[in-house]
């Protein structure tokens, strides 16, 4: 429901981008996701019918009410679990990490909608290595999406050693 021409396009895209990131980084959809998303959709749809809508009244859309649904803070993001789980915030962290293309470490291929279906979750700092020093590894900040082939080549290698190998090639 984005128009094709005019300033309204930019305003609509800005609103929808803010909505998407808010969906990832607030707890609005942790419970009753379908009914809350539908409620937000209805308000967004009504708001966009008025071509002169402004940023000033975004908080009429429930997800933008920062008193009720504040954005995640840095501590919360640092503690976000493994993105393969069901959590919205975890997947949001991975979405941010992938925002600029999610290039594979080895073949430098950019993730696309098609290729990402075949990528694997990879620990930047290997699970086994972190377990040896009794550090939890299943955090979104320790995750990337890479090809299966790259994942097998990297294996349990120390990240510094792997990066040195990549640079020497």
Regions found by a protein language model. Give the residues of each.
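Residues that form generic nucleotide/phosphate-binding pockets
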Residues: 19, 47, 165-166
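Hydrophobic alpha-helical segments
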Residues: 23-26, 127, 150-153, 157
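Non-catalytic, well-ordered alpha-helical scaffold segments
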Residues: 13-14, 18, 91-94, 141-144
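Short secondary-structure subsegments characteristic of cysteine-rich extracellular domains
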Residues: 6-24
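Histidine-centered nuclease catalytic patch
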Residues: 111-142, 158-159
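Polyanionic (Asp/Glu-rich) segments that form extended negatively charged tracts
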Residues: 1-2
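Short Cys/His-centered divalent metal-binding micro-motifs
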Residues: 139-168
